[in-house]
Amino acid sequence: MIIPLIFILASTFGAPQDISALTVEGIQNPETLGAYVREYYKDTPILADIAWCESRMRHLGKDGDIVRGVVNSKDVGVMQINTRFHEATATEMGLDLKSLQGNLKYAEYLYEKEGTKPWNSSKPCWGSK
């Protein structure tokens, strides 16, 4: 009886495997979103570190609006993707930078294309990891 209970608890409190499993409340909660982002980027953990430094694992604010950069309001979402420079390409790829899935997916694309360069402004935070 204890072993099945452990599996139930693990599946309940582990990071969601599917983005659709995240509710708005889950996306607004940095702990829940942080677990999801770390699982999502398990093969490229530097991207999870960057997400922490860029947005403190926040995609939506408490008001439900997308998190925007303090220095540059064109930076959006958990990965702080700049819409001025990247929205057209993201749209061509069928990605919405304001959606969690689109923001995470586009960050993967950027990382594969340019490495960590797009996030160099926050490198003092994640560069030592």
Q: Language-model features: where?
A:
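Export/targeting segments at the very N-terminus of extracytoplasmic proteins
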Residues: 2-57
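Charged phosphate-binding loop/patch that engages nucleotide di/tri-phosphates or the phosphate backbone
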Residues: 14-16, 27, 116-129
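Stable alpha-helical elements in mature extracytoplasmic
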Residues: 29, 33, 43-47, 74-78, ...
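Glycine/charged-rich beta-loop-alpha catalytic/anionic-binding loops adjacent to active sites
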Residues: 31-34, 87-91
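Sec-exported extracytoplasmic/periplasmic mature domains
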Residues: 38, 42, 46, 52-56, ...
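Short, solvent-exposed loop/turn and secondary-structure capping segments
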Residues: 61-64
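Substrate-binding/active-site groove segments that recognize
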Residues: 68-90
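A short, structured beta-strand-centered segment in the mid-to-C-terminal lobe
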Residues: 92-102
